[in-house]
Structures are given as structure tokens and as C-alpha cells.
């Protein structure tokens, strides 16, 4: 309320805020008809993708964490105590468990880097995959398995869309570092 007053925002303009597991109502009859669900199916406040995944994977108490790799890559941990990184490198938010927090680090282009590579550098993989009746990523992964650990000192910084952890910088850009004549496609 104090912040709304400082910003001169009428509280009546805002929707009610719910905790993640709080029941907010039931589904509408037309939605029930389209989905085959009962009209008594409850709707809850919900949670973001990783916060919901934390509940589903049992990461709901101190000392538990998980990682996900999709477009981005996330290390996600539950905390009963708030811990704010003043530099913003690690993010702390209310979690899906009322009264608790989640702490996470995010790299913006984890899995997306693979898609970018396949679409821009590894286009030959798509052609070969079509010929062989498999997926381009199957062929890419097979070649990755043949690559020596350390990739002959080639380092890739996956900052295709800026970065959040450990560098909060939307202008960060990706780099292949250490590229030499020993590296081939």
C-alpha cells in the first residue's frame, strides 16, 4: 500500500494477488465443455515454469535444487530465507511455496545456442539428417561425442541474447574464443 501511495496508483485498478496454491475459482462452463473437464475443476494462482517445476520435482525445502536446459539454462534452488544478490547476478523471487523463496541463475541461450548453431553454421547437418532419416541434433550430438574433452581449447560464450548470470548485461554478445587452424567444422 505504501508503494502504491508513493507512485500515486489507485489500488482498485490492480487485480487481486494470489499465492501460487491458492484457489482462485473454477473453470468456466464453456472451457469445461471444450476440454471435457468438470466445471468443479479448480483454478489456482499458479507459478512460472521453473517455480512450478520445483513443486513437481520436490524442490520445496532448503538444500534442494535442480537444473533445466531449454532455450535458456537455469540452476534453481529453494530457500526458506530471502537472500538478495546486490549485483543481480543471482535472482531471488517468491516461490510457489508460500512464505519461501527461490534463488536462480540463468544463462539466456543454453539450448538456443544449439538451434542457432544448427541453423547458421551446421546447415549441412540438416541435409544429412534428411538423407539419413534422423534429426539434425542426433548427428550433431554424435559429432560432439567424437570431440576431445576441452574441444582443443576452443571456448564458447553463449551470450546470443545478452546475459543474466553471472553478468547482468543485455548487450553481452557470444564469442568463440581460442579459434585456430586446428579447429574445423
Language model region names:
Residues 9:
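Active-site-proximal cap/lid insertion segments
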Amino acid at each position: 500500500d505504501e508503494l502504491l501511495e508513493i507512485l500515486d496508483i489507485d489500488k482498485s485498478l490492480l487485480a487481486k494477488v494470489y499465492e501460487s496454491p491458492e484457489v482462485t475459482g473454477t473453470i468456466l462452463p464453456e472451457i469445461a465443455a471444450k476440454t471435457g473437464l468438470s466445471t468443479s475443476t479448480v483454478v489456482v494462482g499458479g507459478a512460472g515454469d521453473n517455480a512450478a517445476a520445483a513443486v513437481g520435482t520436490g524442490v520445496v525445502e532448503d538444500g534442494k535444487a535442480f537444473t533445466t536446459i531449454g532455450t535458456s539454462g537455469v540452476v534453481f534452488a529453494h530457500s526458506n530465507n530471502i537472500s538478495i544478490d546486490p549485483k543481480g547476478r543471482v535472482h531471488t523471487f517468491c516461490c510457489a511455496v508460500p512464505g519461501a523463496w527461490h534463488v536462480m541463475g540463468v544463462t539466456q541461450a543454453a539450448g538456443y545456442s544449439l538451434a542457432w548453431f544448427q541453423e547458421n553454421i551446421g546447415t549441412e547437418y540438416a541435409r544429412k539428417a534428411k538423407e539419413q532419416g534422423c534429426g539434425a541434433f542426433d548427428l550433431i550430438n554424435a559429432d560432439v561425442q567424437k570431440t576431445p574433452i576441452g574441444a582443443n581449447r576452443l571456448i564458447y560464450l553463449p551470450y546470443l541474447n545478452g546475459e543474466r548470470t553471472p553478468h547482468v548485461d543485455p548487450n553481452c554478445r557470444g564469442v568463440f574464443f581460442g579459434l585456430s587452424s586446428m579447429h574445423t567444422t
